[in-house]
Amino acid sequence: MKYIKLLIVFCLVFIPFKVLAVEDEDIISKAVSGILIDAESGKIIYEKNKDDQVAVASMTKMVAQIIILDEIEKGTIKWDDVITVSKNAADMGGSQIYIEEGEKITVEDLMKGISMASGNDAIVQMAEVVSGSEAKFVKRMNKKVKELGLKNTNFVNCTGLDEEGHYSSSYDMAVIARELVMNHPEILKFSSVYEDYLRENTDNKFWLVNTNKVVCKFMFYVIIILGRMM
């Protein structure tokens, strides 16, 4: 079977992504901005308002993942490194994997929580591991998008929580997603999985279900992080 090698970044304004039906025939008209590209060549197949600056929610985390995976590749951090959770990370709101202050957790489990559950607590913890603080990590994220030549992206946080001055475009997100998949295909071992567990062999087992419901139905697609752009 020939695998589909298309990377889809679609920006929805009228339909919250968590309740979007895959079969919705009106998905294109309800998207305020969107793009479809070939992940290998980068060729644009379809676009709608691709350069409009919009809020990108959890798709923000793709840039963070690139930076984290770069550090793993360099050996600065390792998959099996055990991290002690900070109060700052544990107190994060929004989507979470519910890590607790002082808890011990591996880099691999944090990345699993980021990729599958879009955990804000997990990404902030990894930002602190890599750069010492979220603020310093965000500076590195903005440096990365400039290196990629992106002109319609600026980050204020690493979570994607809505803040003034935090935005991107569907084109920029597609470039970021392509960079992630092509240079770090290992991310797919997390993002293409529909369900898994954290702390599986403990009394505090936590069930992870991928926030991207497309994973359950279309396993041939390159799946990254699904967010809602406004």
Language-model regions, residue ranges each:
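A generic short-segment signal for beta-strand/edge and adjacent turn/coil regions
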Residues: 3, 52-55, 81-83, 92-94, ...
